[in-house]
């Protein structure tokens, strides 16, 4: 990623499993273009740690997670979870962070901490003139 855009992002991930130098990041691996599953490591995809050796994750969230891990001097492990299990995975300590296109709602902020937004989207409805 272009560091010009990410240089002012504060990376604060407390209580990561720094003892082994690994940043464990959860995502759905099913929400393209942010994250998806593929069968090869093409185009910079990374193995999905909890899916055996045959599946890989890729997408914007993977690229950003790779950047964060590299910035912290850590290796990256990506874990695939169902959407409803992502926050629980962080709370239980199974993973250190979530990178999954998750909006910071007040309800979620009661359960986990959020960084600054790294992507903003304006959704619209398109209709015939």
Residue spans for each PLM region:
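Arginine residue identity/basic-tract feature
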Residues: 66, 108, 128-129
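Hydrophobic/proline-rich hinge and linker segments of small-molecule sensing/allosteric domains
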Residues: 24-32, 114-129
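Ligand-binding "clamshell"
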Residues: 94, 106-121
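Extracytoplasmic small-molecule ligand-binding "clamshell" domains
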Residues: 1-102
């Amino acid at each position: 990623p272009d560091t010009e855009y990410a240089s002012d992002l504060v990376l604060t991930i407390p209580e990561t499993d720094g003892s082994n130098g690994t940043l464990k990041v959860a995502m759905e691996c099913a929400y393209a273009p942010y994250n998806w599953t593929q069968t090869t490591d093409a185009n910079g995809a990374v193995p999905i740690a909890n899916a055996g050796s045959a599946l890989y994750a890729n997408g914007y969230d993977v690229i950003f997670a790779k950047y964060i891990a590299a910035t912290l001097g850590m290796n990256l492990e990506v874990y695939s979870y169902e959407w409803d299990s992502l926050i629980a995975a962080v709370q239980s300590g199974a993973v250190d962070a979530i990178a999954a296109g998750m909006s910071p709602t007040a309800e979620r902020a009661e359960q986990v901490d959020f960084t600054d937004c790294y992507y903003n989207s304006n959704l619209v409805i398109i209709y015939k003139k």
